[in-house]
């Protein structure tokens, strides 16, 4: 696989210089009050969790499709996508975030960094990942008159470690080395980001601590073993719901306490600026390759993009390249759990309200008092009560569509795709695959659908075996 410009480099999507922390910490919000979910208290005696709001003075202006790409694709200098995003963090972290932002901009034009990243993505990660025509899945959705859409799978499951997560982990590990940080922390839900982070830490000789909810550790025991085998310390989190939200909170506590020596490799397009922008740009290789491969295969663009959405990194990696191609539909699929009316789901964009969690304003699952509602999904990677702020922005602007799939529907897709294509999907990916059952009957003949096959399902086989009779 040849390294190409599409698969080996990233470029920062914001051209303006980062704002100083003094500018970022004293702004008052002009918007009506939103629900604020505070972070848990720090264990550091010297640190306090104050709220730093970075919302600008003017509310966002609604944008028409096809408008200025800078408005569609870039956060502003405060790290906002419309009213979403920002930096709601303790003062302790402001310098670290500003330092990270400055380094990100600098490395975007650093040829040595780009060459090193390109080499690792090609030779270690195994990019570029194939755009695979799913012949039997396509046949499954063919109607009686012989018409139907054409299904292509962007095979991120074939990356080293078995998911898209390695794209971001490699790049952030290289960035941490440039910052002189030798201690790495990360949160994980399904374990794929934890495995990817442990992998790159082993590769670069960095200390690695992974925070993981105790409930997730039980259902993802294989990935826990893999992380420990790779030399990572996996710390179980028993507070709250003992899932991804709580693991993220614990990782932030650690970062506040050890900010001078530690880099936090956040695994999704969530959290305070610059993480949503930075993680998106490190995953944008997915969409760049897809554009190139589509041109090679059929001489055009995809008609429809489909990806699962928890925090939203794999979806944003695919979507970002096509945001300004307004004829390309972008569809995100959330976890409906036991059903949207059951109260046991993780459909943040479908059922959530605007609030603040883990350093950013976005849609959240919360009650009338602003307290987080416990999410549920059979998929540990989608079991999160928030979502990346850019997804919230796309929802409000109408640029992307968001739907939800139940546990039962995802399990059926898990089995169906395994038997039709000989590829065992992750439970996260199975949610996107399940949505094809609803989408494909509505599509015209020859519509080209690209689905981001975000991860393989080895990690989920034990969980699925409890539910499926095979």
Swiss-Prot record:
Pathway: Amino-acid biosynthesis; L-tryptophan biosynthesis; L-tryptophan from chorismate: step 5/5. GO terms for molecular function: protein domain specific binding; tryptophan synthase activity. Residues 1-10 have a biased composition (Polar residues). Gene3D superfamilies: 3.40.50.1100. The modification N6-(pyridoxal phosphate)lysine is found at residue 165. The beta subunit is responsible for the synthesis of L-tryptophan from indole and L-serine. This is Tryptophan synthase beta chain 1, chloroplastic. It comes from Arabidopsis thaliana.
